[in-house]
């Protein structure tokens, strides 16, 4: 099929590669505009743009895809299908209706659960046992279109937002190619979503990562994993930002208040929470590198009985 591909982050790259490898003709790649990054504010390509250019595919980077001139530009490519994977802009009805096979989206959840942004991180934060990817024919709503195919993934006990991102990116790429084959063969079935079962997720912000030590240890540990590698869970120690990259749930003690560092060993640091405690495994003090707790304690003195900021 002749394809227009729309996507922006690393998550989208695997699907673009899979479509190319499957022998489809990618006529155009649409991605978000380049953004300045780093201290030097150097303009950086999106991961999808880098992939497209490596394959010699034309790239289009509109600020607003819904503008009339941009819609007419897309129309010139006479695509059979538009594939959308984490593009980052809402498509107008005129774009949705443009290709004969419609616009197909790969969404990183088992719809109708987790419509919206950041479904990968929220699956970890909420302690889900399973999640997955869904392909759907897009309509004017946000992740409300008719479903075509699903693939389920089990979360590992130590699953992080980053590791689940990689799993679902690979699974989504595979499912997209399978979905395209069903559409081309005329065997695709379109199942409406049950809106009564729908749940919605919100964007992940840096502020979400601030650890509330009054919450149960189980919830905090899931937050730590879900926000690894971005934006990370953090607290404050002696006025400095202190990131927690990994921790284990342990039994706590009613003798200590939440946030109290009640035990410091050679390689251990135990923190009381609202229910249970956490043994910190990998940490990072402001201005320092990530390191295991033992390495941190050898280079930084922490008083037993001191507190992280609540």
Swiss-Prot record:
Gene Ontology MF term list: methionyl-tRNA formyltransferase activity
Function noted in UniProt: Attaches a formyl group to the free amino group of methionyl-tRNA(fMet). The formyl group appears to play a dual role in the initiator identity of N-formylmethionyl-tRNA by promoting its recognition by IF2 and preventing the misappropriation of this tRNA by the elongation apparatus.
Class of enzymatic activity (EC top level): transferase
UniProt-listed Gene3D superfamilies: 3.40.50.12230
Reaction catalysed by this enzyme: L-methionyl-tRNA(fMet) + (6R)-10-formyltetrahydrofolate = N-formyl-L-methionyl-tRNA(fMet) + (6S)-5,6,7,8-tetrahydrofolate + H(+)
Matches recorded under SUPFAM superfamilies: FMT C-terminal domain-like (SSF50486), Formyltransferase (SSF53328)
A Pfam family annotated for this UniProt entry: Formyl_trans_C
Protein name: Methionyl-tRNA formyltransferase
Its EC number(s): 2.1.2.9
GO cellular component: cytosol
Keyword annotations of the record: Protein biosynthesis, Transferase
Family membership noted in the UniProt record: Belongs to the Fmt family.
Domain of life (superkingdom): Bacteria
Residues engaged in binding (6S)-5,6,7,8-tetrahydrofolate: 109-112
InterPro entries associated with the record: Fmt, Formyl_trans_C, Formyl_transf_N, Formyl_transf_N_sf, Formyl_transferase-like_C_sf, GART_AS, Met-tRNA-FMT_C, Met-tRNA-FMT_N
PANTHER family membership: METHIONYL-TRNA FORMYLTRANSFERASE, METHIONYL-TRNA FORMYLTRANSFERASE, MITOCHONDRIAL
